[in-house]
Amino acid sequence: MRAHGRSAMTVALGTTLLVQSSLACAECDPAKSAEPIASRFETHGDTVYDRNTNLTWMRCSYGQVWIENGGCSGSVKLLDWDSAMGLRLPGNAAWRLPQKDELGSIVATNCKRPAINETLFPGTPSVQYWTSTTSGPSYAWVVFFRTGMSTWNFLRTTSFAVRLVRTGP
């Protein structure tokens, strides 16, 4: 039993290290222009409103919890596409999985690992995020926040991260 516990601890530590390495600070290129944050985005605690797209985003990935003045805490929960499409937050049914272009609108093209503004979306891991945009009967689009690129060739049974959005402020 003792050896079993030690193996579980090793696996847990390995998983923690993997997650921590994907949460390292973004690498941003100062030579590429970044959009001024203040003119486009308004932060409201655990949400951020994008004036350009009229969308409000959860600042934390699904599974994480917003801590005022502390960012996002906890582990990102990975879901298959059907589960992600069925997510409903208590008290507000307006939250949904974003379309490919919507999720692509928050990619920071001057950054990678993650390719997102970490002031607005702290704790975003450099992993794939589901979109609601399908590609045939078995596939859906994802945005890979390691690079900011979108791709369509992932089976909907695969588990990826989720960031929820709603229309309006």
For each feature predicted by the language model, list its residue ranges:
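Glycine-aromatic-enriched surface loops/turns that form tight recognition elements
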Residues: 2-6, 20-96, 100-169
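Bacterial N-terminal signal peptides
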Residues: 10-20
